[in-house]
């Protein structure tokens, strides 16, 4: 029931040391990232690498045992973004200033909402403040991520 060290290493490297939900960089964060079970163990999810993702403490905490979120535009219940089966850039973009994640599909929007990826409901936007510093440091956002066009 515990993920072994070799698997942890694989998950970290595969994720390029980024949270697979909010693309925070582990090195720039105070807390070590968690190995997230995409289908939670409480719902029968396995320790197979196909069911694992690297997640920062905030995303891991907000995701908890949830596998769905609400699309704020339609109020529909939508499965959360699945880092193994879906591609981040198909569902999310960065705002022009690189500080906020914008969901561009129902999956993206439901995930942004559930994980509060821009700290709009919690922490007084502290993740946005951290991103501003990372941006100044040249670590953020990841180069391959799309940004909103003006
Ligand atoms: Zn995260």
Q: Residue locations for each model-derived region?
A:
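Extended charged
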Residues: 1-6, 10, 25-28, 50, ...
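Flanking scaffold residues of small Cys/His-coordinated metal-binding clusters
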Residues: 14, 30, 47-51
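Active-site-adjacent scaffolding segments
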Residues: 17-18, 28
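Short beta-strand-alpha-helix junction that forms the catalytic/metal-binding core
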Residues: 19, 43-63
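Right-handed parallel beta-helix
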Residues: 21-23
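Histidine-centered catalytic micro-motifs used for acid/base chemistry in nuclease
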Residues: 34-40, 56
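Short edge-strand/loop segments of extracellular domains
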Residues: 38, 43, 72-74
């Amino acid at each position: 029931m515990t993920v072994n060290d070799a698997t942890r290493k694989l998950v970290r490297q595969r994720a390029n040391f980024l949270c697979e939900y909010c693309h925070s960089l582990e090195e720039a964060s105070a807390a070590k990232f968690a190995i997230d079970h995409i289908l939670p163990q409480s719902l029968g999810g396995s320790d197979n690498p196909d069911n694992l993702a690297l997640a920062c403490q905030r995303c891991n905490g907000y995701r908890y045992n949830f596998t769905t979120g609400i699309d704020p535009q339609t109020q529909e219940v939508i499965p959360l973004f699945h880092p193994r089966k879906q591609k981040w850039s198909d569902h999310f973009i960065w705002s022009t200033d690189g500080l906020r994640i914008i969901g561009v599909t129902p999956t993206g929007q439901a995930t942004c909402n559930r994980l509060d990826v821009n700290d709009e409901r919690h922490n007084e936007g502290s993740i946005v403040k951290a991103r501003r510093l990372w941006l100044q440091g040249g670590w953020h956002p990841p180069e391959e991520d799309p940004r909103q066009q003006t």
